[in-house]
Amino acid sequence: MSANLKYLSLGILVFQTTSLVLTMRYSRTLKEEGPRYLSSTAVVVAELLKIMACILLVYKDSKCSLRALNRILHDEILNKPMETLKLAIPSGIYTLQNNLLYVALSNLDAATYQVTYQLKILTTALFSVSMLSKKLGVYQWLSLVILMTGVAFVQWPSDSQELNSKELSAGSQFVGLMAVLTACFSSGFAGVYFEKILKETKQSVWIRNIQLGFFGSIFGLMGVYVYDGELVSKNGFFQGYNRLTWIVVVLQALGGLVIAAVIKYADNILKGFATSLSIILSTLISYFWLQDFVPTSVFFLGAILVITATFLYGYDPKPAGNPTKA
């Protein structure tokens, strides 16, 4: 049963990651009549959906009892204001990160984005060393060097980029790259900060996600007011929303829940395998379906290095199955 859950969670992760990147990219480049949907509002809606999903999961864990659900939410959130406030910092950073991903995929093709975004492995590792005093092995340090080399190859200018010059200017690609790099740093810091909180307390990951979603909604609404307030007052909060937009929002809302399931049922090596599959699928679909990406030999070399680094970082050279003596 656990093996089935392991591969099911990884399969869902591949589907969710690939689908989110491709649909978000397509939705931001699709030319339609009327105003385009506002990414700031999509981030808020995704946070609200995540809260609803987590409440349902807590309800399930409390044996489908509304009374038990109400008691848990009251005891774990309202009665522990300081514990809840701890999530304000990572929540604000995650909200910034989610907005940056929309900026990145508005300016970069899905394949380039997918590979470059794996730099979050590097930032997560560095923040883990500094904040959690985590020690990295030789294989992990080597994988980080390979990762940086691979991403550098992926971002290496090539003649094939001239084919996309009508769609993407050098300026917009620079904006996309800066958005991805900033998202990598924010993802690394927020992820390690969240891990530190989870390890220091006994609250469930679903309660913590509800707290994250609560602050995320507040920060997201502040972003809507500051950056898109005029457009919202003119055309409405849900301007430009269509079926594709809702698919993007739902996929983004499910992202954190899928990661939680993978952490629970799988391991780093299989998670790396899922990430690698997602990169390959994104590359193929970007080339054959979206037709906004022409892979080069340099890109393939970089992608192979990134995939290798992903596996190597999760590799444990210690033999498994030897029980420790008491």
Curated annotation (Swiss-Prot):
<feature type="transmembrane region" description="Helical">
    <location>
        <begin position="244"/>
        <end position="264"/>
    </location>
</feature>
<keyword id="KW-0472">Membrane</keyword>
<comment type="subunit">
    <text>Interacts with SLC35A2; the interaction is reduced in the presence of SLC35A4. Found in a complex with SLC35A2 and SLC35A4. Interacts with MGAT4B.</text>
</comment>
<dbReference type="Pfam" id="PF04142">
    <property type="entry name" value="Nuc_sug_transp"/>
</dbReference>
<feature type="transmembrane region" description="Helical">
    <location>
        <begin position="212"/>
        <end position="232"/>
    </location>
</feature>
<feature type="transmembrane region" description="Helical">
    <location>
        <begin position="269"/>
        <end position="289"/>
    </location>
</feature>
<keyword id="KW-0225">Disease variant</keyword>
<keyword id="KW-0762">Sugar transport</keyword>
<feature type="transmembrane region" description="Helical">
    <location>
        <begin position="174"/>
        <end position="194"/>
    </location>
</feature>
<dbReference type="GO" id="GO:0000139">
    <property type="term" value="C:Golgi membrane"/>
</dbReference>
<dbReference type="GO" id="GO:1990569">
    <property type="term" value="P:UDP-N-acetylglucosamine transmembrane transport"/>
</dbReference>
<feature type="transmembrane region" description="Helical">
    <location>
        <begin position="293"/>
        <end position="313"/>
    </location>
</feature>
<dbReference type="GO" id="GO:0015297">
    <property type="term" value="F:antiporter activity"/>
</dbReference>
<protein>
    <recommendedName>
        <fullName>UDP-N-acetylglucosamine transporter</fullName>
    </recommendedName>
</protein>
<feature type="transmembrane region" description="Helical">
    <location>
        <begin position="136"/>
        <end position="156"/>
    </location>
</feature>
<feature type="transmembrane region" description="Helical">
    <location>
        <begin position="4"/>
        <end position="24"/>
    </location>
</feature>
<comment type="function">
    <text>Transports diphosphate-N-acetylglucosamine (UDP-GlcNAc) from the cytosol into the lumen of the Golgi apparatus, functioning as an antiporter that exchanges UDP-N-acetyl-alpha-D-glucosamine for UMP. May supply UDP-GlcNAc as substrate for Golgi-resident glycosyltransferases that generate highly branched, multiantennary complex N-glycans and keratan sulfate. However, the exact role of SLC35A3 still needs to be elucidated, it could be a member of a catalytically more efficient multiprotein complex rather than function independently as a single transporter.</text>
</comment>
<feature type="transmembrane region" description="Helical">
    <location>
        <begin position="38"/>
        <end position="58"/>
    </location>
</feature>
<keyword id="KW-0812">Transmembrane</keyword>
<comment type="similarity">
    <text>Belongs to the nucleotide-sugar transporter family. SLC35A subfamily.</text>
</comment>
<keyword id="KW-0333">Golgi apparatus</keyword>
<keyword id="KW-1133">Transmembrane helix</keyword>
<keyword id="KW-0050">Antiport</keyword>
<dbReference type="GO" id="GO:0005459">
    <property type="term" value="F:UDP-galactose transmembrane transporter activity"/>
</dbReference>
<dbReference type="GO" id="GO:0055085">
    <property type="term" value="P:transmembrane transport"/>
</dbReference>
<keyword id="KW-0813">Transport</keyword>
<dbReference type="InterPro" id="IPR007271">
    <property type="entry name" value="Nuc_sug_transpt"/>
</dbReference>
